[in-house]
Amino acid sequence: MSKAQRMRIKLKSFDYKLLEQSAKKIVETAKNTGAEVSGPVPLPTDREVITIIRAPHKYKDSREQFEIKTHKRLIDIIKPTQKTVDALMRVELPAGVDIEIKLKEV
């Protein structure tokens, strides 16, 4: 008897609009192949703040801050079939979205 599998997909992007579009594409593709989908679940946004001094020599009180936000989503596909895996491999995602896929036995 084989154990059931679960596919966990993590998406990361600096642009939340691209991230939402990609998550929607993945969910639609998985549902069209007959798999159960849980998500997309929004994960906490990472915020990195970088502070630099504006002047090249002195004036340490004059500073400027920049921030980079990394938005994340989690999608679980329960009991994926071979058809689901093949369809997900063919999905084209934008260049600004990082995807991490893990298969896990439940």
UniProtKB/Swiss-Prot annotation:
GO cellular component: a single term: ribonucleoprotein complex
Keywords of the record: Ribonucleoprotein, Ribosomal protein
Lineage top rank: taxon: Bacteria
Gene3D superfamilies: Ribosomal protein S10 domain
Pfam families noted in UniProt: Ribosomal_S10 (PF00338)
Any one GO molecular-function label of the UniProt entry: structural constituent of ribosome
GO biological process: translation
SUPFAM superfamilies in alphabetical order: Ribosomal protein S10
Function statement: Involved in the binding of tRNA to the ribosomes.
Binding partners and assembly: Part of the 30S ribosomal subunit.
Annotated family: Belongs to the universal ribosomal protein uS10 family.
Protein's UniProt name: Small ribosomal subunit protein uS10
